[in-house]
Amino acid sequence: MARKKIALIGAGNIGGTLAHLAAQKELGDIVLFDVVEGVPQGKALDLSQCGPVEGFDANIIGTNDYKGIAGADVIIVTAGVARKPGMSRDDLLGINLKVMKAVGEGIRDNAPDAFVICITNPLDAMVWALREFSGLPANKVVGMAGVLDSARFSTFLAWEFGVSIRDVNTFVLGGHGDTMVPVTQYSTVNGIPVPDLVKMGLSTQEKIDAIVQRTRSGGGEIVGLLKTGSAFYAPAASGIAMAEAYLNDQKRILPCAAYVDGEYGVNGLYVGVPVLIGANGVEKVIEIELDDEAKGNLQVSVDAVKELLEACKGIDPSLA
């Protein structure tokens, strides 16, 4: 049986980490693409030389030509720039929209049957634009946000309760930003909902509220510490979890930025919701019942995503 092919668009910190994880897990052969000559080739060569040490047989190549992604089963997109001090949201949107246009056209022309995972920020707008530019079906284009945000939420809760991270299960919905919605009613420690643990006296509502806020600003906290970059280990691990769910038809329920068409009262947007990922991509949007507070918070998040999309349409009229 032919090996699967994983194409990684963008060979920065996340792209390189994605390649390493995909090779370690033997997900398939790997193509690293970047517009900067030498970078994907150099990282591919370096990673290939990990093979004898780590015991993987994945073939890893680097390229500056979109033809190199032809026939990819999974494509993970990290290309674009990070927001820098003094850069407005519209500046970031303008730059990364152009990147998504080039990437979308490259995917459309070379790998139209791929399952595409977008990681580029601002995520909810970029995954929407990428689908528009690529013309792929909505179930085959998804954004990586909720898996990462939920991992951050789970980490902070495990620390607070002093329990194994394996026993913590959380959901973060909504947009990937300050308006995201960590849902405590569906967040559990070995099946026990967080609100019940608070009632038992194992934490306080004030501490849980602080953890919710820390989750919302989780990416910014890491940027503030690193000063010259942003998170890449956990984002890459999150993207790989989504790729595995598709490649291995795992039928996993994961929070992702997915296209919603009526679910949660939302139409025609990409927003963070629980979805079932299997061999057909996003096979189902899972509509869970939310309490009034979570519903209100989700609506605020949806409105923020709508604003981003309107800004995108203003920058590139072809999206209107």
UniProtKB/Swiss-Prot annotation:
Catalytic machinery residues: 176
UniProt keyword Nuclease, yes or no: no
EC number: 1.1.1.37
Residues binding substrate: 83, 89, 121, 152
Keyword entries, A-Z: NAD, Oxidoreductase, Tricarboxylic acid cycle
Catalytic reactions on record: (S)-malate + NAD(+) = oxaloacetate + NADH + H(+)
Protein's UniProt keywords contain Transcription: no
HAMAP family linked: Malate_dehydrog_3 (MF_00487)
Family indicated by similarity: Belongs to the LDH/MDH superfamily. MDH type 3 family.
Protein name: Malate dehydrogenase
Species per Swiss-Prot/TrEMBL record: Novosphingobium aromaticivorans (strain ATCC 700278 / DSM 12444 / CCUG 56034 / CIP 105152 / NBRC 16084 / F199)
Gene that encodes the chain: mdh
